[in-house]
């Protein structure tokens, strides 16, 4: 469980920002969203494979030189 102690004379916004940063760093929110609904193992494998293909094409596209338009 993540918790943030609000320091004396510290604005609420700053404490909230620290809390959000801590939650983001631990990956709690992404894990919670992933477990919101049950995902069948076959769907999970398909989703991960599609993401891997997308990453692969994105990496290839970033490594190729742009076409010259002159």
UniProtKB/Swiss-Prot annotation:
Record keywords: Ribonucleoprotein, Ribosomal protein
Gene Ontology cellular-component annotations: ribonucleoprotein complex; ribosome
Superkingdom: Bacteria
InterPro entries in the record: Ribosomal_bS21, Ribosomal_bS21_CS, Ribosomal_bS21_sf
GO molecular function: structural constituent of ribosome
GO biological process, one term: translation
PROSITE patterns: RIBOSOMAL_S21
Family the UniProt entry places it in: Belongs to the bacterial ribosomal protein bS21 family.
Name the record gives this protein: Small ribosomal subunit protein bS21
Organism: Methylobacillus flagellatus (strain ATCC 51484 / DSM 6875 / VKM B-1610 / KT)
């Amino acid at each position: 469980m993540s918790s943030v102690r609000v320091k004396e004379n510290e604005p609420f916004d700053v404490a909230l920002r620290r809390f959000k940063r801590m939650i983001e760093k631990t990956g709690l929110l992404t894990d919670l969203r992933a477990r919101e609904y049950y995902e069948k193992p076959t769907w999970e494998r398909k989703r991960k494979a599609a993401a891997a293909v997308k990453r692969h094409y994105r990496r290839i596209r970033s490594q190729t030189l742009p076409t010259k338009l002159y």
